[in-house]
């Protein structure tokens, strides 16, 4: 017989640096999930990734206190900042100076990496979503 799902929890954890301190510890602890077991499993699963990369993770926990987790691709904003070589977006997007610029080729590479996590039918739709995110961060799309 299948385990009964008690709930799901969505967190964003930096790759290779899950630890029991807030916000991870309290979020897992109040649901009865073994915090250290999750931290060890997550860090092992992300050891090949760039340390510090934000990874969205969906944790499904069961009534017997066991859990499974699924990792997704880093957020679009992370990829945009990395490609544009900036630390943060514009404080006033759409007005004044641009925070940086990206080419259509860079947007396409991000879209291909994020395609399975996006709600887009094709690569052009995914590129349009990512261009919108770039404009919202004050980035200019050229080419």
Swiss-Prot record:
Keywords: Methylation, Ribonucleoprotein, Ribosomal protein, RNA-binding, rRNA-binding. Part of the ribosomal stalk of the 50S ribosomal subunit. Interacts with L10 and the large rRNA to form the base of the stalk. L10 forms an elongated spine to which L12 dimers bind in a sequential fashion forming a multimeric L10(L12)X complex. It comes from the Bacteria. InterPro entries: Ribosomal_uL11 (IPR000911), Ribosomal_uL11_bac-typ (IPR006519), Ribosomal_uL11_C (IPR020783), Ribosomal_uL11_C_sf (IPR036769), Ribosomal_uL11_N (IPR020784), Ribosomal_uL11_N_sf (IPR036796). Pfam families: Ribosomal_L11, Ribosomal_L11_N. One or more lysine residues are methylated. Belongs to the universal ribosomal protein uL11 family. GO terms for molecular function: large ribosomal subunit rRNA binding; structural constituent of ribosome. It comes from Rhizobium leguminosarum bv. trifolii (strain WSM2304). GO terms for cellular component: cytosolic large ribosomal subunit. This is Large ribosomal subunit protein uL11. One of its GO terms (biological process) is translation. Forms part of the ribosomal stalk which helps the ribosome interact with GTP-bound translation factors.
């Amino acid at each position: 017989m299948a385990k009964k799902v008690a709930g799901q929890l969505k967190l964003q954890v930096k790759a290779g640096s899950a630890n029991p301190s807030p916000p991870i510890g309290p979020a897992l602890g109040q649901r009865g999930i073994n915090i250290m077991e999750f931290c060890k499993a997550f860090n092992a699963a992300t050891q090949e990734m760039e340390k510090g990369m934000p990874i969205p993770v969906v944790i499904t926990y069961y009534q017997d206190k066991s859990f499974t987790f699924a990792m997704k691709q880093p957020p679009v904003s992370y990829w945009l900042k990395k490609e544009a070589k900036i630390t943060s977006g514009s404080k006033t997007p759409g007005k004044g100076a641009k925070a940086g610029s990206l080419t259509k080729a860079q947007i396409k590479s991000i879209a291909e990496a994020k395609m399975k996590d996006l709600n887009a039918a094709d690569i052009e739709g995914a590129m349009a979503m990512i261009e919108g995110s770039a404009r919202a961060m004050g980035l200019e799309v050229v080419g």
